[in-house]
Amino acid sequence: MEYERRGGRGDRTGRYGATDRSQDDGGENRSRDHDYRDMDYRSYPREYGSQEGKHEYDDSSEEQSAEIRGQLQSHGVQAREVRLMRNKSSGQSRGFAFVEFSHLQDATRWMEANQHSLNILGQKVSMHYSDPKPKINEDWLCNKCGVQNFKRREKCFKCGVPKSEAEQKLPLGTRLDQQALPLGGRELSQGLLPLPQPYQAQGVLTSQALSQGSEPSSENANDTIILRNLNPHSTMDSILGALAPYAVLSSSNVRVIKDKQTQLNRGFAFIQLSTIVEAAQLLQILQALHPPLTIDGKTINVEFAKGSKRDMASNEGSRINAASVASTAIAAAQWAISQASQGGESTWAAPEEPPVDYSYYQQDEGYGSSQGTDSLYAHGYLKNTKGPGMTGTKGDTSGAGPETSLEGGTDSVSLQAFSRAQPGAAPGLYQQSAEGSSGQGTATNSQSYTIMSPAVLKSELQSPTHPSSALPPATSPTAPESYSQYPVPDVSTYQYDETSGYYYDPQTGLYYDPNSQYYYNAQSQQYLYWDGERRTYIPALEQSADGHKDTGASSKEGKEKKEKHKTKTAQQIAKDMERWARSLNKQKENFKNSFQPISALRDDERRESATADAGYAILEKKGALAERQHTSMDLPKLASDDRPSPPRGLVAAYSGESDSEEEQERGGPEREEKLTDWQKLACLLCRRQFPSKEALIRHQQLSGLHKQNLEIHRRAHLSENELEALEKNDMEQMKYRDRAAERREKYGIPEPPEPKRRKYGGISTASVDFEQPTRDGLGSDNIGSRMLQAMGWKEGSGLGRKKQGIVTPIEAQTRVRGSGLGARGSSYGVTSTESYKETLHKTMVTRFNEAQ
């Protein structure tokens, strides 16, 4: 706190022109090389030498100091120190003083109670908070004694260390040990309070332990501190309130990083202080707290903003590694899910196909706590053989993993645990009976979905779902479905991950795809979707299996109607995409090459969730996800193109019509009509849902995006010959059209226009040069002659009263350029009215006469 007396200019001259008699400056430089700004008095040296005691201070200064203490005690405030600033040479008061309080609350209460003013010995004094120290780029800080030196000093004011040595970065422990941080007294920088009593013992560390603990961050020490693991809903006021007992900060010192879309903070904030010493002291205080610093129920991690990278590895697995694993596994998941959902007609892979090991995807990832169980797609997973975390063999319906059990008429799928625990979330069980139809008779089969609690952290590799051919007869009893309920996902807490392009959910450990609105579990390599009615995450694989059953049940009705629906396999879709990519490269147009046609779902098919299907989202993101991967890797084919592929559950339930002759015979309007779901009022081509039928029709008629997607959809079903013809037509349209040449060829070249007629007819007389009328002399008909005749002048007489002037008019003569008046050869008697021939003749005559 600063008390400044509003006196005259002479009372405050000591602040700017005082001399400095310290021994380290020598006898040559006796004047102080700075302007004595109102910096914090705690940065002033405490011992000024023996000269300090020689001055006899006046009684008024002592009375002022006692008056300040008396007023503080009358208000019940005990100040830690009251220091009146004096001139070192004269001992006179410099007109201001500092009052240090024990707590920030006492200083604030004192300022508010006195309204920033005080009466001392009949003099009105204004009170202000002490100003911060000069900026670090103006003055330099001594790392040995901690004194702030002015920028023009070549050595430290207190300890005499040269500037080059004092500015070298020392270990943080050495600097903090030499400061008075554990003492909680005067050597603290501005804005920081002393260490509380319980934490002073923690601050007094040995130099070895402190240097070892702070060595990584001391190399990157700066004046900015970062706070990590903030609550997304934490505000600036909550951060300032949590740091109020340890530092005097304002909103200008704290910067909270917010998300542009949600306007919530992204989990971290920066605190910028005036100097590195203040940042180091505040960092030491916050790191020494036991229990650690908490803001809005979240434990905060504090470190230098530009410190070394932290070791992100933890017991439950690295989040960054999980993100890279997720982005690497997506391409393989396209083929694995399609192979896993074939149904009862096919197995996981052909027995004669050579074994393929996909464990190289996990190379150098270190994902999770174990290496064997965390492989993305191990050989046992694809081949239905024994693998890490699996106890069953191929064809064995009972020997499943520890989390998988098969009973009569029940398919049990256990979803692996989420990667992070959610405290206090005890999910309940939600049971719902599901009835299905089989081809042999009317019976009910139930499926049990068991989604483990987020509190479970151990991940185990699950065995794949057995095909429907392994189910017992249709006389199995009915069992209810059990689901684990979870809170509604909070999108505001999601964090964007650049490696995978997904949003990471810190509560469940899942990765969210905003385009397809599906969740990806990096541990179980499964896609999930949120079911609002069941309040749980449902695997997309099971959803596709249900759709496959419904498709098989409704196939008989289709046969009765003599209508056979073709399906696209993954290989056919890949061929369509390659053909479409070739046409785009030829046209050099920027179309989206990851389009896949979608067929409208029939009313009697299975009731799906509000989100899009996982199979379409996976196949659509094939090209985009391949570009996101850091290392390009080719996926081996799981099945040969020559072998006819049976219908697959995931693709057969949601894919469009196949590229066959039967499809080509159908009309374009019929195929385009299937791209609209009138029941749900959704455009399946643009993947948009509308509130009313009128809005959907208006979208189809006016939307440019719909027209562009429709053109892409039409081109995707054209043959190669039609594409070439269309390409040739487009190239012809892109050529330059010379419309002027077309007009000349059609109408001919027009005749040039006739010249404009003159306003006055007849041939005009030849123009006479303006000097020609005076060539033969001036006549008596000019205006000058008439004016002279009016004044009594007669032709042949001279000018003047007595006719003594010139008789003939003065004629203009030409002289040589650059010659002076009267110089020899300057004039040859040539006038401006003479022609070139006459001028040349006179010049030659004049030169001849001068030569003689």
Swiss-Prot record:
One of its GO terms (molecular function) is identical protein binding. A zinc finger (C2H2-type) spans 681-706. Transmembrane segments: none annotated. Residues 1-14, 21-45, 545-561, 665-675 have a biased composition (Basic and acidic residues). It is found in: Nucleus. Residues 463-484 have a biased composition (Low complexity). The modification Omega-N-methylarginine is found at R824. The modification N6-acetyllysine is found at K306. A zinc finger (RanBP2-type) spans 135-165. Keywords: Acetylation, Metal-binding, Methylation, Nucleus, Phosphoprotein, Repeat, RNA-binding, Zinc, Zinc-finger. GO terms for biological process: 3'-UTR-mediated mRNA stabilization; cardiac muscle cell myoblast differentiation; mRNA splicing, via spliceosome; mRNA stabilization; negative regulation of cell growth involved in cardiac muscle cell development; negative regulation of cell population proliferation; negative regulation of mRNA splicing, via spliceosome; negative regulation of ribosomal large subunit export from nucleus. GO terms for cellular component: nucleolus; nucleus; protein-containing complex. Residues 1-78, 343-365, 386-410, 426-446, 459-489, 542-568, 634-675, 740-783 are annotated as: Disordered. Its main location: nucleus. Residues 37-132, 223-307 form the RRM domain. Pfam families: G-patch (PF01585), OCRE (PF17780), RRM_1 (PF00076), Zn_ribbon_RanBP (PF00641). Residues 780-826 form the G-patch domain. InterPro entries: G_patch_dom (IPR000467), Nucleotide-bd_a/b_plait_sf (IPR012677), OCRE (IPR041591), RBD_domain_sf (IPR035979), RBM10_OCRE (IPR035618), RBM10_RRM2 (IPR034992), RRM_dom (IPR000504), Znf_C2H2_type (IPR013087). The modification Phosphoserine is found at S61, S640, S645, S655, S658, S660, S703, S719, S767. Residues 430-446 have a biased composition (Polar residues). Associates with the spliceosome. Component of a large chromatin remodeling complex, at least composed of MYSM1, PCAF, RBM10 and KIF11/TRIP5. Binds to ssRNA containing the consensus sequence 5'-AGGUAA-3'. May be involved in post-transcriptional processing, most probably in mRNA splicing. Binds to RNA homopolymers, with a preference for poly(G) and poly(U) and little for poly(A). May bind to specific miRNA hairpins. PANTHER family: RNA-BINDING PROTEIN, RNA-BINDING PROTEIN 10. This is RNA-binding protein 10. It comes from Rattus norvegicus. The lineage of its organism: Eukaryota, Metazoa, Chordata, Craniata, Vertebrata. The gene is Rbm10.
